[in-house]
From Swiss-Prot:
InterPro entries: Kinase-like_dom_sf, MAP_kinase, MAPK_p38-like, Prot_kinase_dom, Ser/Thr_kinase_AS. It catalyses: L-seryl-[protein] + ATP = O-phospho-L-seryl-[protein] + ADP + H(+); L-threonyl-[protein] + ATP = O-phospho-L-threonyl-[protein] + ADP + H(+). The modification Phosphothreonine is found at T106. The keyword ATP-binding applies. The TXY motif contains the threonine and tyrosine residues whose phosphorylation activates the MAP kinases. PROSITE patterns: PROTEIN_KINASE_DOM (PS50011), PROTEIN_KINASE_ST (PS00108). One of its GO terms (molecular function) is ATP binding. The lineage of its organism: Eukaryota, Fungi, Dikarya, Basidiomycota, Wallemiomycotina. This is Mitogen-activated protein kinase HOG1. Proline-directed serine/threonine-protein kinase involved in a signal transduction pathway that is activated by changes in the osmolarity of the extracellular environment. Controls osmotic regulation of transcription of target genes. Its cofactor is Mg(2+). It comes from Wallemia sebi.
Length: 278
């Protein structure tokens, strides 16, 4: 039943919903494990040492390696929903809640920096590759200390991406269904890719190699979580016997429904009732 989604998303690198209750005013409260800080706060206070960059990236990919085969996509990964405690344990929060939030409220700006280009170019079905893009942006920010693609708005967002990656490849342009978007992309100045080594002079060859595979313009060419976690850069942490994969797909189709918020409350409530029986 609907209880699937939360019940089966139990993983060390994902925040578990420990308890949920609905107040008399029918607000939904998610009581989650509390972790010390988030990556956004951590990055704004000081540059990260290399071993932390590595370990944090590993844990993010470990979470995605688990959920992606189940057909679950976060869609809104950014440093502020990556929680970290004093032992450097990392957990991703807000899985499956991205659609519940009102875009006006979520501080669209911070989110935009981490949005995959295909979301802006097509607005149609997109898949787990969008999470890999977001984690690639977060990886770059951990290396460099500042956001890699700080777009001021939708249009500027694509411009800053092309300034580093060069013009979108043909196979990406061919997926664009909207004529307006197509015209916009055709009007962008033709750009060559800038070598990542030039943009990130302090990064190691292994870091650069993995980063380029994660920030591929074409979602179909972009590396998967399962492949990224096996990259030599993450060898110190990679342990196939300790990287579980969700063993069944579950249906979050209700998550795509465009429902008024009061209906969401009822739905979430039923989901939670079912979940709490386990």
């Amino acid at each position: 039943g609907r209880g699937n989604s939360i019940k089966h998303l139990r993983h060390e690198n994902i925040i578990s919903l420990l308890d949920v209750f609905i107040s008399p005013g029918e607000d939904i409260y998610f009581i989650t494990e509390l972790l010390g800080t988030d990556l956004h706060r951590l990055l704004s206070s000081r540059p990260l040492e290399r071993q932390f960059v590595q370990y944090f990236l590993y844990q993010m990919l470990r979470a995605l390696k688990f959920v992606h085969p189940a057909g679950v996509v976060h869609r809104d990964l950014k440093p502020s929903n990556i929680l970290i405690n004093e032992n450097c344990d990392l957990k991703i929060c807000d899985f499956g809640l991205a659609r519940l939030q009102d875009p006006q409220m979520t501080g669209y700006v911070s989110t935009r920096y981490y949005r995959a280009p295909e979301i802006m170019l097509t607005w149609q079905e997109y898949d787990s590759a969008v999470d890999i893009w977001s984690v690639g942006c977060i990886f770059a920010e951990m290396i460099d200390g500042r956001p890699i693609f700080p777009g001021k708005d939708h249009v500027h967002q694509l411009t800053v991406i092309t300034e580093l990656l060069g013009s979108p490849p043909e196979d990406v342009i061919n997926t664009i269904t909207s004529e307006n978007t197509r015209r916009f992309v055709d009007a962008l100045p033709k750009r060559e890719k800038i070598p990542f080594q030039q943009r990130f002079p302090n990064a190691s060859e292994e870091e650069i190699d993995l980063l380029e595979k994660m920030l591929d313009f074409n979602p179909k060419e972009r590396i998967t979580a399962a492949d990224a976690i096996q990259h030599p850069y993450l060898a110190p942490y990679h342990d196939p016997s300790d990287e579980p994969v969700a063993n069944e797909r579950f249906d979050w189709s209700f998550n795509d429904a465009d429902l008024p918020v009061d209906q969401w409350k009822v739905m979430m409530y039923t989901e939670i009732l079912i979940t709490s029986e386990f």
